[in-house]
């Protein structure tokens, strides 16, 4: 099955391949005229890389888009630490995996801490997961988004969806009226929350049974199962379904930007983990601990903090996302009213306050086995 932008796994992925396959020479040399970034899509776009290349004439700037966080991590573990200068992943990996294994290195606080002052309040504190336990700055946050579920507000009001939360999909009246966007890892997290469980704590015994029951019901009563967000949005627009399980700003924004503002990402008002029922992904970009580093790495990381480049990062590749730099009035002014509406800026702060940080799912191996069996049946 084709891997999609947010369909990441929590298990180790065997890394294979030759470093030169991407056209990058791993041999040590003076590399201050080179910069290589391993990233989610967007940072590899011409709208982001083009201006940096123009600002650094003669530099060779390359980017490769990954398919999952663990896959990108395993590239570094397999020896590509000698290739990459920056890595862009979701929030738990820098502190929990990359830094403890010496795969990334601290950033210059004197250079980068002032940028937190210009970020949205949720990040200006500054954002805790950007730091190692010893206080080192290990990543800069930029793109983010609440990610729970999506409804057609012409059929299900925003207020009702937020009040009911995940229970909406357990209502017998919803049978055959919704789809499941099959981003497996996210489905597992969301089914845990639907079952009243904390997806980031160990799950066993009777709690496994709760998860199994919910997985079977959610998957069994769905009208559509697909990992294609365009197909899912189209099904909502065409009236085939009224909602879809697993989704948010990232998936709803293309349809909203095209005028279908009745398609809305929903974050439950309450949930089983400290009163929260939503989950938010936040990307961090970190400096790889390359033994032959390039000065262009931190130059690029500082470059993407600029208002116009932050806007380019937010609106690329056919999906649109908020960025932490929108706390800077100069950056916010780059977005017009339609763009702000597409990313649901009106409720972002509220949605964030109701959301848990995405973390590694503790019992993933057991839960994905249950999920997969329920999906096949």
Locations of regions flagged by a protein language model:
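N-terminal secretory signal peptides and thylakoid transit peptides that target proteins
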Residues: 1-16
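Mature extracytoplasmic/periplasmic domains
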Residues: 29, 283-351
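Early extracytoplasmic/lumenal segment of secretory-pathway proteins
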Residues: 30-97
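Short helices/loops that flank or line small-molecule/ion binding pockets
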Residues: 50, 73-84, 99-101, 168, ...
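Hinge/lid segment of periplasmic solute-binding proteins
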Residues: 73, 96-144, 159-162
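Ligand-binding "clamshell"
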Residues: 98-106, 134-136, 254-270
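Ligand-binding pocket segment of bilobal, Venus flytrap-like solute-binding proteins
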Residues: 179-183, 187-191, 199-268
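Conserved C-terminal helix/tail region of periplasmic/extracytoplasmic solute-binding proteins
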Residues: 342-377
């Amino acid at each position: 099955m084709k891997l999609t932008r947010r369909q990441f796994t929590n298990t180790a992925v065997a890394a294979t391949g030759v470093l030169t396959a991407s056209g990058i020479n791993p041999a040590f040399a003076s590399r201050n005229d080179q910069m290589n970034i391993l990233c989610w899509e967007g940072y590899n776009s011409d709208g982001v890389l083009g201006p940096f290349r123009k600002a650094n004439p003669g530099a060779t700037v390359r980017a490769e888009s990954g398919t999952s966080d663990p896959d990108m991590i395993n590239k570094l573990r397999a020896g590509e630490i000698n290739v990459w200068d920056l890595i862009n992943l979701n929030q738990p990996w820098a502190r929990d995996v990359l830094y403890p294994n010496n795969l990334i290195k601290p950033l210059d606080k004197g250079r980068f801490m002032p940028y937190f002052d210009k970020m949205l309040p949720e990040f200006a504190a500054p954002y805790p997961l950007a730091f190692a336990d010893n206080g080192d700055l290990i990543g800069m946050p930029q793109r983010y988004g609440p990610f729970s579920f999506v409804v057609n507000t012409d059929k299900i009001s925003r207020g009702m969806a937020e009040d009911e939360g995940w229970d909406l999909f357990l209502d017998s009246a919803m049978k055959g009226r919704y789809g499941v966007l099959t981003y497996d890892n996210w489905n597992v997290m969301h089914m845990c929350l639907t079952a009243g469980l904390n997806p980031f704590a160990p799950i066993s015994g009777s709690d496994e049974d709760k998860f199994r029951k919910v997985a079977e019901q959610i998957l069994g009563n769905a009208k559509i199962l697909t990992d294609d967000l365009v197909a899912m949005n189209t099904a909502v627009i065409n009236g085939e379904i009224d909602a879809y399980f697993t989704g948010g700003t990232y998936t709803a924004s293309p349809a909203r930007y095209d005028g279908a503002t009745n398609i809305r990402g929903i974050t439950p008002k309450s949930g089983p983990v400290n009163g929260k029922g939503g989950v938010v992904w936040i990307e961090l970009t970190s400096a790889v601990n390359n033994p032959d580093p390039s000065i262009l790495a931190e130059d690029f990381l500082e470059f993407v903090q600029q208002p116009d480049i932050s806007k380019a990062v937010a609106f690329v590749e056919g999906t649109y996302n908020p960025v932490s730099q929108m706390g800077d009035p100069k950056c916010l002014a780059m977005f017009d009213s339609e763009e702000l509406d597409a990313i649901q800026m009106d409720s972002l702060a509220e949605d964030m306050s109701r959301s848990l940080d995405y973390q590694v799912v503790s019992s993933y191996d057991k839960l994905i086995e249950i999920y997969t069996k329920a999906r096949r049946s």
